[in-house]
Amino acid sequence: MSFLQSERIIEVQDQQEMVGILGRNDELLRVIKEHYESVIVARGNVIVFSGEDNEVGQIETLFKELLFLYRQGMPLTTHDVRYSIGMIAEGRLESLHRMYADTIIVTNRGRQVKAKTLGQWDYVETIKRSNVTIGIGPAGTGKTYLAVALAVKALKNKEVERIVLTRPAVEAGEKLGFLPGDMQDKVDPYLRPLYDALYDMLGSETFQKYVARGTIEVAPLAYMRGRTLNDSFIILDEAQNTTPEQMKMFLTRFGFGSKMVITGDITQIDLPNGKNSGLKQAAYVLQKTPGVGIIRFGEADVVRHEIVAAIIRAYENYDSRRQKQREADNDNNAGK
């Protein structure tokens, strides 16, 4: 069976655009060539590709999309290229456009923050329309970073009066009372990922100014007890390490004009043996509650180095095999 062959050309404005869509040292071009059998050659300001007609059509669509994104000021990564290839192959170009069209915020250094997967886009849209959003998924899915970006955007747009970020201050069995230094010294290491995200969005000087005014508060979860948080964007990070009692306490801090986001990874629970995770319980108890949105991220939503996705996949397969083995052992014991 023979397929119709064709050749097409994409022309760019200059070498800067060529590097922008093919990557430094053709890093992005190599990713593209891995996915297609067609011959792809870049020379001067022209990219020529030839092969089976349907595949050539997909390649043309891909390059046009990459060129469009680059011209919108978006630095392209290998993840962007791989994800775009997959979406185009599935005929979901419109969804890809919609996802990349929305810039959440521009960081202090001028970088555009956007959703990078449909799962992330769904998460962002859920946060926008929900009073409380629970985001569950592995590292690298942007759960916390995107929530912080939306919080900063809401603050800048005067939709809220302050941002409150918190996480459990006891992880991996460490008790704050046994750590050296004053309370700030003790809690800073636990809150550092939240500081990092805020520094990225605002810059150190603006962040410190907001903290001094009380516009931004970063504190351990225990500091939330007995408060009602009105007109606030509230984020609870590492929520898998809350107990059910702590989670209920946190949820009931919600006040008028506020928005709440809870993030965590239920495969990384550091609670002592016998302690249930408040995040797992909340996701179950609140799944049908009006105003509450629940998003579960998967491997496809990991936007880090490819090795991170591979590691997550390996652990998920391992956990699945262990679960099946436990079920088989239980069945065998029941039959004795």
Feature names for model-found ranges:
Residues 1-3, 89-103, 320-336:
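Intrinsically disordered, low-complexity linkers and terminal tails enriched in Pro/Gly
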Residues 2-20:
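Short glycine-/aliphatic-rich beta-strand segments at the starts of folded cytosolic domains
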Residues 9-11, 48-50, 296-298:
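Generic structural detector for well-ordered beta-strands
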Residues 41-100:
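Interdomain "pre-motor" coupling segment immediately N-terminal to P-loop NTPase/helicase cores
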Residues 46, 106-121, 126-236, 240-336:
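Conserved helicase motor core of SF1/SF2 NTP-dependent helicases
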